[in-house]
């Protein structure tokens, strides 16, 4: 179905692989910048995003993320900051944005900014806070912030998937017949790839497919007015296919990396043996019948874990969980090469009305200009 695929460069202004903030700025503002700048150029000058520029053209604007609402990938669409972790600045900008719809998995992260304070700020700015299960109670014309754990690895029964939220938001934003921009980010895919948790990453990729399905259904009803752009802020983990992959293996792992690590920490605190810890790790990733060589690898990782030691090959993560997941991945034809970002090109897919404006797409910073041209404003990003 998707014939228009473009190899896309994602390096930052210094020529290295971009971070979430730098790549988010490129995608939202059309400018390559330094690693941790959000909606600022390399000299710290503020940039105006595609979202703000389209809002000035009377477009409705919606922002959805399955992560925290201050996530550095989506924040440059509405906030300006010189560092990635400035949640108060981001929330303040969100409140001033006047955007029509936001949805996120949570309002804050850590103890730097209490969720209660964020809630108060949003309500004072005229936003209605809506729990995920009440997605269908929202009405056109309202300014809503939907709070819902839409991640496949966290979602509870009865709460909407990321695709459901996308469909609901598109319906609200299009109700008055005017144009709209809806940005949907599945940041959890990046989160799990950084931890080399292939099973959880694959589950979240399937969850993101529900977003694409929702977009395609909307496009089928409005074929002359809808443009779908599917891209990535950057590559992380450098996951490669090394052999024939067994289907469905990722569904057997019921716990995420962090949940598995917490369980092993608890077992260790209760003085369980190495063999018990190894057996628990293997059970959680559904690996059976390990060879002597594989068992020795797990023993070394277990000792490192118990001694609180870190080696480069395990990054900052739990060695035993990482080694168990690596054994599982090897059996399923997958392999990670790093825990960090890479400068590898990503693929941008374009479908729908105005897709011809992307033929010259080379860099992620070209994307907002192409979208603006498709919307009928060819010089919007250069004004």
Where are these regions (language model features)?
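A post-motif C-terminal structural segment
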Residues: 1-25, 74-383
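Extracytoplasmic mature domains of secreted/periplasmic and thylakoid-lumen proteins
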Residues: 25, 32-93, 98-99
């Amino acid at each position: 179905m998707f014939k228009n695929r473009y190899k896309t460069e994602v390096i930052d202004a210094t020529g290295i692989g971009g971070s979430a903030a730098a790549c988010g700025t490129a995608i939202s503002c059309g400018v390559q910048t330094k690693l941790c700048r959000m909606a600022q150029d390399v000299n710290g000058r503020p940039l105006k995003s595609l979202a703000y520029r389209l809002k000035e053209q009377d477009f409705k604007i919606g922002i959805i993320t399955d992560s925290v609402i201050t996530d550095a990938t989506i924040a440059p669409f509405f906030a300006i900051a010189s560092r990635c972790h400035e949640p108060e600045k981001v929330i303040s900008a969100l409140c001033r944005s006047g955007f029509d719809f936001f949805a996120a998995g949570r309002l804050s992260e850590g103890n730097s900014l209490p969720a209660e304070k964020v809630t108060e700020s949003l309500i004072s700015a005229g936003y209605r806070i809506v729990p995920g299960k009440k997605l269908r109670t929202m009405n056109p014309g309202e300014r809503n912030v939907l709070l819902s754990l839409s991640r496949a690895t966290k979602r509870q029964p009865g709460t909407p998937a990321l695709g459901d939220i996308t469909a609901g938001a598109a319906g609200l934003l299009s109700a008055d017949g005017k144009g709209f921009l809806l940005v949907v980010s599945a940041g959890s895919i990046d989160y799990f790839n950084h931890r080399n948790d292939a099973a959880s990453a694959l589950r979240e990729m399937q969850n993101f497919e529900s977003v694409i399905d929702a977009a395609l259904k909307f496009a089928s009803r409005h074929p002359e007015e809808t443009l779908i752009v599917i891209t990535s802020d950057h590559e992380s983990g450098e996951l490669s296919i090394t052999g024939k992959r067994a289907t469905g293996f990722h569904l057997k792992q019921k716990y995420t990396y962090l949940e598995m690590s917490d369980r092993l920490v608890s077992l260790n605190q209760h003085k369980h043996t190495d063999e018990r810890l190894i057996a628990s790790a293997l059970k959680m990733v559904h690996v059976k019948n390990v060879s002597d060589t594989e068992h020795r690898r797990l023993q070394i990782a277990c000792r490192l874990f118990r001694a609180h030691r870190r080696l480069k090959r395990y990054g900052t993560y739990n060695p035993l969980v990482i080694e168990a997941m690596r054994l599982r991945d090897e059996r399923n034809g997958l392999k990670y090469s790093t825990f960090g970002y890479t400068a590898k090109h990503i693929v941008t897919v374009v479908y729908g009305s105005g897709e011809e404006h992307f033929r010259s797409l080379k860099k992620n910073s070209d994307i907002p200009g192409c979208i603006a041209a498709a919307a009928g404003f060819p010089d919007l990003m250069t004004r």
